[in-house]
Amino acid sequence: MKRLILAAMLAAGMSGAAHADDALKAAIANSERASANVARDGARHPYETLTFFGIKPTMTVVELSPGGGWYTEILAPYLREKGKLIAAGESPTSAREGARKYAANLTKKLESKPAMFDKVQRGVFEVPTTYDFAKPGTADLVVTFRNIHNWTGNGDEKVKEIFRKVHESLKPGGVFGVVEHRAPAGKEPKADSGYVQEAYVIKMAESAGFKLAGKSEVNANPKDKADHNKGVWALPPVLANKDVDREKYLAIGESDRMTLKFVKQ
């Protein structure tokens, strides 16, 4: 049954840009996705987020720092037949042990379901040193989900460098789609809170030549005031404070997130 559903999903992906929404819905409904990932669809809004970015099944898409592969499970089958997905993460040969571990975990993930991941290409995106994920001017869409807070500790110049590398990788008119934990406007977040000011992200993007093409509130959560002990990780799904105020954090839900669409002119 799972193979039949996956086959139907892939067929939907081959039906062309006119039916891109149906193909994306099919990718999200794919029964091969991990159940724990599916359970978070209501908080992460993958359909609304990706359609806002303008994704099409014929695109070359770069996913920066795919982590555990939450979005990779959707992007890989969606792009499998007519597009290309580049999973850009740590290098398997990195000098850093932690980076090699992340790379090995991603390899294990991709090799676990070849029918879903067999056409995923790998690129290197290892902050703050190595960015070798796509040739200049070849990507239609680059996406990053809740990663920018991991870049900021390296300083503004390093953050600007990352945005420049993304800009360089995109075709003219290409899109950089960003989702990030959002600090309240005018409130400087603690460095280790996981939150970033929206104005800061826009400033960094514009410094690299991007134009802000749109904002979406699809991933907004007004209940999140970004003032938690242990930062954003106090909230689901991590619940870093364990049983302390657990019900309070569950009632808040996942973080308030900016969703920004930048275009290379």
Feature map (PLM): residue ranges:
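A short SAM/SAH-binding and catalytic strip from SAM-dependent methyltransferases
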Residues: T129, A139-K160
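Conserved beta-strand signature within the Rossmann-like core of class I S-adenosyl-L-methionine
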Residues: I86-A88, F163, G173-R182
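A short glycine-rich, Lys/Arg-flanked "PGG" loop and its adjoining helix->strand segment in the class I
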Residues: A76-P77, E157-P172
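C-terminal lobe and adjacent flexible extensions of AdoMet/dcAdoMet transferase-like proteins
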Residues: E247-Q265
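Conserved class I S-adenosyl-L-methionine
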Residues: K56-G67
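Short glycine-dipeptide loop
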Residues: T58, E81-K82, L170-F176
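Conserved Class I S-adenosyl-L-methionine
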Residues: P189-K215
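A short acidic, Gly/Pro-enriched loop at the edge of an enzyme's catalytic core
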Residues: F117-V120, Y131-V142
